[in-house]
Structures are given as structure tokens and as C-alpha cells.
A protein has these predicted regions:
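C-terminal/domain-edge helix-coil "capping" segments
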Residues: 154-206
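Bacterial Sec signal peptide processing site at the extreme N-terminus
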Residues: 13-35
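N-terminal export leaders
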Residues: 2-7
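Surface-exposed short loop/turn segments
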Residues: 87-138
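N-terminal segment of the mature soluble domain
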Residues: 37-98
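Short secondary-structure boundary motifs at beta->alpha junctions and helix caps
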Residues: 60-62, 134-174
Length: 206
């Protein structure tokens, strides 16, 4: 093999890097809500469902650290606290994805062209469950945010991480609003656990 052919071969390190690119590392402090007051619920226990919804092969959010689903679950753990003597609450990640999408009317083939974007959708639900797992109430929050995509893998990872941080911050705000709107009778505002909710609380069929 002559020198010209040798110069055309990529370094082995480059090939290895392309074969297995690690997930992008987060920039700045980790996602956390421990600095905020707890949303105290008049339930005996809270279950954080760790199921990660599958949004398909174009989901960038599943490769982040934390992933989009994990970021939603961090919010649930940090914000919620059981402060009662009966019933149970379940926090569910309904959707958590950052998808690469083509904009309408664009026909380019590469992510470098401005017709591609990242679309983040986060949805969570808190359910109150009574005897026989009967649902006594629920609150659901969702946010959707977008950002231009990048052609470079590392740059796309940084953009996705920033987008996830903004979306989870907004989800936290929306989640607390929906909690106070739909489950206000289940919130404990004082220092002690509240008595069981009054009989007038509406029950919803599954």
C-alpha cells in the first residue's frame, strides 16, 4: 500500500469514536427541585412509577443524562411528600421525549439544514388511589417546547439538554398549578397531616 492510500485512511480512534459515541454530559448543575417547598399530600404513600415511555428511534431524549423520563421522575421525587395516614398516590410519566422532526415543506436530507428541529414533550400525571385501587382524583400536566436542531452530534446533545432543562422547569410550574386546581382538597398546608378528605370529593371511574 503506497503513502497516498495510507493518508486516505481515517485514524482508528476516529472510527472507534464514531462507532460508540457516549451520551452527552450535562452542563451546569444537575436537574433538581429540592430547593422548593414540598407539595404535601394527604396520603400514606407515594409511588414514583419508573416506567420510561418509548417514543421511537428519533427520540434524542432517551440518550441524555438524565434521560427525559428520568428528569420528569426527579421532579416527582423532589416535589411530592406523603403527609397522611391512608390512601396512596401514584406519579406517572405519561410522555417524555425529544424528537428530531422535519419542518413542513422542507425536503433537505441532513440535520444541518434549518428545516429540522428538536421537539420536546413532557407529560406527567398524579393519581390518588383508595381501596381496591379505585381512583379518587388526579392531576395532569404537560408542556411542549422546540429548538432548532444541529448537524453536529455533540452540539445537538447540548441543545437537547438545554431544551430538557427548560421544559422540566416549565413542567414543574404547570404541575404545581394543576395540583392546586384539581387536587386542592388533598394538599396539606399546615404542620400536621390533615384528616381524611370530606365525603364530597368526587370519585372518577377508571
Amino acid at each position: 500500500m503506497n503513502r497516498r492510500h495510507l493518508l486516505l485512511l481515517p485514524p482508528l480512534g476516529v472510527l472507534a469514536a464514531c462507532a460508540a459515541s457516549p451520551p452527552p454530559m450535562p452542563e451546569g448543575p444537575g436537574i433538581s427541585y429540592t430547593y422548593l417547598p414540598k407539595l404535601r399530600l394527604n396520603v400514606a404513600s407515594i409511588d414514583i412509577d419508573e416506567t420510561r415511555p418509548n417514543a421511537g428511534p428519533t427520540d434524542v431524549g432517551r440518550s441524555l443524562q438524565p434521560s427525559a423520563a428520568e428528569a420528569v421522575q426527579i421532579m416527582g421525587r423532589d416535589r411530592l411528600a406523603a403527609f397522611g395516614t391512608q390512601h396512596a398516590a401514584r406519579f406517572i410519566t405519561v410522555r417524555a421525549a425529544i424528537l428530531r422532526e422535519r419542518l413542513p415543506g422542507q425536503t433537505g436530507l441532513f440535520a444541518s439544514d434549518p428545516g429540522e428541529r428538536l421537539s420536546c414533550t413532557l407529560t406527567c400525571r398524579l393519581e390518588i388511589r383508595g381501596a381496591n385501587d379505585l381512583r379518587l382524583g388526579f392531576a395532569e400536566a404537560t408542556v411542549s417546547r422546540t429548538a432548532p436542531s444541529e448537524s453536529n452530534l455533540a452540539a445537538r446533545g447540548r441543545t437537547a439538554t438545554s431544551l430538557l432543562r427548560r421544559a422540566t422547569f416549565d413542567l414543574n410550574t404547570e404541575f404545581e398549578f394543576q395540583m392546586r386546581r384539581a387536587l386542592r382538597d388533598w394538599l396539606v398546608e399546615g404542620e400536621r397531616a390533615a384528616p381524611p378528605p370530606p365525603g364530597g370529593v368526587m370519585r372518577e371511574s377508571l
